[in-house]
Amino acid sequence: MGESDVRLTAWVHGRVQGVGFRWWTRSRALELGLTGYAANKPDGRVQVVAQGSRAACERLLDLLTGGNTPGHVDKVISDWGEPADAIAGFTER
């Protein structure tokens, strides 16, 4: 992790489970050089945790809210923080 790395946690609401959303998110994150995961939650949301440069995380957030995702995103609630322990790769959980 670099000195200026950040951790983005995004809670994605809408029809985002069972539509390839986590796979799509993983692909975009890897293209941006981010590490982290996308996980289905029991309440129907997807939690996205990404670590890397602020610019790359901001771009991922733009993509999550941009309207060209699988399914339908109603809203995204994001939280920014310091990177936690190193995460290897970007996984679907």
From Swiss-Prot:
EC number, as in UniProt: 3.6.1.7
Similarity section: Belongs to the acylphosphatase family.
Species of origin: Mycolicibacterium vanbaalenii (strain DSM 7251 / JCM 13017 / BCRC 16820 / KCTC 9966 / NRRL B-24157 / PYR-1) (Mycobacterium vanbaalenii)
Protein name: Acylphosphatase
Leading EC class: hydrolase
Catalytic residue list: 22, 40
Keyword set includes Hydrolase: yes
Transmembrane feature ranges: none
The gene coding this protein: acyP
